[in-house]
Amino acid sequence: MNPEVFREYDVRGIVDRDLNPEFVYLLGLAIGTYALRHNVRQMTLGRDCRLSSEAYHDIVGRGIRATGVDIIDIGLCATPMLYFSIRHFQADGGIMITGSHNPPDFNGFKICIGPDTIYGDQIQELRRIIESSSFATGEGTDRQEDITSTYQDYLFRHVDIK
């Protein structure tokens, strides 16, 4: 595990080098464990259109569910839609898989507890959980939801462009 993937505001690295399937699964276990320690029982999960995002989405979701956290899978979406989904579904948090503005060989994970993105020492706690292998165990559920039209309706009702 490359400790440098645990950045200030996200977990980010180079696809297949830093972010391989084994690491992404362990990250899912760490996110689920961290979430449960903060009374999070349900999280939304979204991804961008990068080539690696779909596979990472499936793997990290499997890890999170293995801790007992339930997933609301919103699939392919923009990052603001992930934030919207947390409030819309009254979820306890969310995870967005996105490379953001970084080069195509990068990808990353933005993690929210409640509506707030974790950062700093909170991100480092994920690393410590992986290093100690002290993961929660359980059986979380997974349900698919499409929020695209709901998000668009919300924007049309609340954004006034003149």
Q: Which functions belong to the PLM regions below?
A:
Residues 1-62, 66-67, 144-162:
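An N-terminal, well-structured beta->alpha segment
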Residues 6-7, 12-16, 20, 77, ...:
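Generic, ordered loop/turn and secondary-structure boundary motif
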Residues 27-30, 65-68, 94, 116-120, ...:
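Short, surface-exposed linear patches
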Residues 33-34, 71-74, 100, 121-127, ...:
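Short, surface-exposed, polar/charged, turn-prone segments marking secondary-structure boundaries
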Residues 38-114:
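Ferredoxin-reductase
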Residues 107-162:
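Gly/Ser/Thr-enriched, mixed-charge loops and adjacent short helices
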